Amino acid sequence: MATEEDVKQRQIIESRARNISHNVRCTECGSQSIEDSQADIAILLRKLIRDEIKSGKSDKEIYKKLQADYGETILYTPKFDLQTAAIWLSPVIVGGVAAGVWAYQKHRQRTNVHIMALNLVRGVPLTPREKETMLDVLTPPPPANKWWWPGK
């Protein structure tokens, strides 16, 4: 008959095994954890995890062994390194560059119109007030709607 200590020990092993199994991806199913999968490889991995726990290994050691044997994709939470950072940050960087190019083009377009207006009145003998009036007439007004969405 099992003692109370043996029952507690089995419960601890089972709890740790389930916790680890929920964080390990089934290599056949891909979208399921090995805890939820009934594939042969998932059953074998669950047994391997329980054996490793019984032999006294820590969770971290078990994760490292699984990662070494099956690759980084077996874990649902891969380590965060330079490559992972590049993958996650690339959309933000591309969006920032696109916004910068768009803003530069808008600024350049406004500046070019002002420079063309100055070039038109450059050689003409005008008083400062006439020159200012000509620039006001030749320079287009800023757009009335500054929001990208018309309802604002």
From Swiss-Prot:
It is a single-pass membrane protein. The keyword Transmembrane applies. One of its GO terms (molecular function) is oxidoreductase activity. GO terms for biological process: cytochrome complex assembly; embryo development ending in seed dormancy. Heme binds at C26, C29. It comes from the Eukaryota. Keywords: Cytochrome c-type biogenesis, Heme, Iron, Membrane, Metal-binding, Mitochondrion, Mitochondrion inner membrane, Transmembrane, Transmembrane helix. This is Cytochrome c-type biogenesis CcmH-like mitochondrial protein. The gene is CCMH.
